[in-house]
Each structure stands twice: as structure tokens, then as C-alpha cells.
Amino acid sequence: MAVPKRKTSPSKRGMRRSADALKAPTYIEDKNSGELRRPHHIDLKTGMYRGRQVLTPKESA
């Protein structure tokens, strides 16, 4: 059975655990509409992505 040669220091343990935290999703302000949206994603309200019309926007009832 594999046994560690040295005790893992609290610093090394913390560095390893730093990747386990849940990170909040990032949002950017859309240049055209001013709404918040995810980067590299289509704006669902306008249907635009990188200056091009990709989707037809849904009609609000």
C-alpha cells in the first residue's frame, strides 16, 4: 500500500483544495442592449452573437 513519505503541510493542502471551490459565473454587459449576458454566448433577447443575427428573438407576450 502506498504511504506518503512526508506529512502534507497546511499550505499544500490548501493549494490543492483551492480548485474545489464553486465559482460564480461571470457576466458581461452587452454592447448593444446593455443587458448582462455570459461571455461567448448568444444574447437570447436579441439573438445576436458577435455582431451577427444568429437566432430570431422570441416575441414577448
UniProtKB/Swiss-Prot annotation:
Instruction: Give the start-end ranges of region Disordered.
Output: 1-40
Compositionally biased, Basic and acidic residues: which spans? 28-40
Alphabetically, the GO molecular function entries are: structural constituent of ribosome
Residue ranges annotated as compositionally biased, kind Basic residues, are 1-16
Tagged with keyword Ion transport: no
SUPFAM superfamilies, alphabetically?
Zn-binding ribosomal proteins (SSF57829)
Domain of life the protein comes from: Bacteria
Cellular component annotations (GO), alphabetically ordered:
large ribosomal subunit
**Keyword field:** Ribonucleoprotein, Ribosomal protein
Query: Could you list the residue ranges that cross the membrane?
Result: none
Q: Which GO terms describe its biological process?
A: translation
Family assignment from sequence similarity:
Belongs to the bacterial ribosomal protein bL32 family.
Q: Supply the name of the protein.
A: Large ribosomal subunit protein bL32
Recorded source organism is Sinorhizobium medicae (strain WSM419)
Source organism phylogeny: Bacteria, Pseudomonadati, Pseudomonadota, Alphaproteobacteria, Hyphomicrobiales
